[in-house]
Amino acid sequence: MEQVDYNCIFCAIAAKRAPAAIVYESADALAFLDIHPVMEGHTLVIPKKHCRNLFDLDDESGKAVMHAARIVARALRAAFSADGLTVLQSNERAGGQAVFHYHAHLAPRFFNDGLMARMETERQLAWRARGNPTREELERVAEKIRAHIKED
């Protein structure tokens, strides 16, 4: 762990200066239970190195988090006999990020758990309000994004 933000609760958890129910730890990543779970077993996976969000995440930390997420996902499926898993990751306040240390949410999912129905309703309302794009509109947006692609 090279970089720490001493005002960051997730850095404090990674340094064992704040309590957490840890489910997995590697040299560069940590997984612990969310204190506001949407489902039993809802787990957060973080890099131990402080990275604000996906925009700041370095390749080494990203690989460590995804490796840990795969291990924890398999454990969640086995521990809860889950039918599936939702992975959520938010960036910046407008994207729904509340703690500014990169983290991925892993939530075990079950048929008829109600969570997908709420998400599906919101998505359908958004689609109705916006409408589905034409193929030409999709190509225009894709070109706009491609113009800004930069390899690290």
Feature-to-residue mapping (PLM):
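HIT superfamily nucleotide-processing domains
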Residues: M1-D152
